[in-house]
Amino acid sequence: MSYFGTDGIRGKFGELPITPDFILKLGYVTGLVLIENSQNSARKPSVVIGKDTRLSGYVIEGALQAGFNAAGVDVHMLGPLPTPAIAHLTRSFNADAGVVISASHNPYYDNGIKFFSGDGKKLTDEMQNAINDKLDTIMAATGSNDALMPILDPAQLGKNNRIDDAKGRYIEFCKGSFPYQYDLDHLTVVVDCANGAGYSVAPRVMRELGANVIAINHKPDGININAHCGSTHPEGLQAAVLKYEADVGIALDGDGDRIVMVDEAGHLVDGDGILYVLATQGQTKVAGVVGTLMSNMGLELALKAADIEFTRAKVGDRYVMQELEANGWILGGEPSGHILCLDKSRTGDAIIASLQILAVMQARGKALSDLTEGFEVLPQKLVNVRLSQMQDPFEHEELVAAFDKARATLEGRGRLLIRQSGTEPMIRVMVESDDEIECDVMANDLADKIKDTLG
């Protein structure tokens, strides 16, 4: 079976695959794959491990560490840090891989594992397949662990060390992405940390660049991560921006790789709006922008008006990255807030993306609401249909017929997207149209039909 979804391995803690026993085996087989692929047989491979603020992260961290050590791999422990920090520090420490323990924007009871290669990019499909194949073998042989996980001579085991200055290293990296000729003096910024991995570093970066920072949802307790806060629940940020009369608001998700923003009037600026500002008014001229199938048609039309090419990748930041590299471009992202600025960082980074927007505001002396003028969002309705188990809607003729009929109705003035979640039993129904009422009715009707058919 395949253990990897669209963004690593994820599930509810205590249920396969997110159990201590499975995670131990995952660390072990990943260590074996790293050893097999090592270009330097004279040294032990090494990995860095970071996590978000979920309580279950401590258990998973220990199991992963033990698995890697048993395979003969050294481990550098980073503690709670945003996902892009782990990607950066993987390169900084010349490690063979980076490991993130997080379920991103999911609730606290979920957790997951995602990997970076030594260059700070998501693992290749080939590497994931190699890990998956070894997992299949070891999971199929219940009770044979002694044979499948041979004990190494103690001299060959991996060792661990904790990196005490990991936060400081990442903070300096983020600050280095901000143009030296500007600062954030006289700017009031509300930062919603989602009680997640960015709770400490995000406010510090802004403060050290001179901003008056009002941090909210920055006191994690292990179970309040993403709880009615962060990029998936921006209502609190919008209220805080208005309450404190702030210049701008920034919301991260639980692992710090997604961002949405709020302008001074309390209006939400999602990933599409951020891409528009950076593409049309940013510090670096761009030839083209990569969005996804979920990107609003309004972004495509606004970029076309500015003579900037636009193309769509499959949903997922790894596919945005692939399309950027194929085109030789540097800017891409998703409406959900994964923003890739490849001239600043090799992975999606909420803090770095926000700094680029703040730099544009300072350079042009404009409010965020002024910068987003010219970008008109087409009415869009997204409905998530939660199912009892993973099912494919395209295997049911009556659903396919309903989808085809809706697409014919929207032809030339809108879009329909039906997408299965890669991490949970959910179907996403997205309708765009020049008619807001039609959007709402069509999306809900199709969602009801999916729910009635698939349960």
Curated annotation (Swiss-Prot):
GO molecular function, one term: phosphoglucosamine mutase activity
Post-translational modifications: Activated by phosphorylation.
EC number(s) per entry: 5.4.2.10
Cofactor binding description: Binds 1 Mg(2+) ion per subunit.
PROSITE patterns cross-referenced by the UniProt entry: PGM_PMM (PS00710)
GO biological process per UniProt: carbohydrate metabolic process; peptidoglycan biosynthetic process; UDP-N-acetylglucosamine biosynthetic process
Binding site for Mg(2+): 104, 253, 255, 257
Cofactor(s) of this protein: Mg(2+)
Positions bearing Phosphoserine: 104
HAMAP family assigned: GlmM_B
Function text: Catalyzes the conversion of glucosamine-6-phosphate to glucosamine-1-phosphate.
Protein name: Phosphoglucosamine mutase
Protein species of origin: Psychrobacter arcticus (strain DSM 17307 / VKM B-2377 / 273-4)
Source taxonomy: Bacteria, Pseudomonadati, Pseudomonadota, Gammaproteobacteria, Moraxellales
Encoding gene per record: glmM
